[in-house]
Amino acid sequence: MKAQKTENGITMLQADCFNPRDILECGQIFRFDRDGEGNYRVFSLDKYAEIKKTNDGYFISTDSPDYFYDFFDLDRDYGVICEKLSSSYDVMKRAVEFGRGIRILRQNLEEMIFSFIISANNNIKRIQLIIGRICEALGEKTPFGYAFPSVKKLAEVSSPDFYFRLGAGYRAPYIYETANALKEGFELDRLKELDSVKARKALLDLKGVGAKVADCIMLFGLNRFDVFPVDTWVKKVYHRYFETGLKDSEISTFFVDTFGDLSGFAQQYLFYFLRTMDKGGKM
């Protein structure tokens, strides 16, 4: 794959390991949509990009090419990752072939904390709706929509009822209390210096952050690839293809022991494969 930055975007040629559908619809991001022509629009903090198909690849149209070059992790050779994972298990090979265009995004840590608190026991459409309402209510207006609000803005609302009225349900106090915890001194920068075990333990101190949410935050907000978030789809993957008699609480450790520093990549390929195929028909 070749990626070249220009003043108004990024040109993608020979995009073997880059497919916007795979990247944006594999459960790692919620602030995106697709227009009537099939182009994907992506929002991160106050930044915006539009991904358009070209004859020989894709063009990422944006006035923030440096930001989105890093955001899409375009310096990483995903071909090597695909090759290593494909040689491990037959189902892993099938999952990689199916979702070969996936790239794990390098997203903002604060945005990931609140997005995945909202994601708990929720579906993607509703998650997107809640996040969109929060951005519209508290975020700065940009030419392309509303920015994700700062921690200061999230914390300055009068009570959790504000988020309840936006549809957050039982997660409303979690958003409110976590925003205030971050505002009052929870050291996000310190998480980047901790190993994954200690970072997870620190994240679990935040309201609304359980094991799965903590692992998602670490994978998508800290780019810790030695984690394996477990939800109902991952449990299905384990019981269908890897069954060894473990309790559900032990599945994440099993996969991390199996895939090591490639665990996060393996999780995304397997999750996307099973969820898409199970919803669309038999494998």
What positions do the PLM features span?
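HhH-family (HhH-GPD) DNA N-glycosylase catalytic core used in base-excision repair
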Residues: 1-283
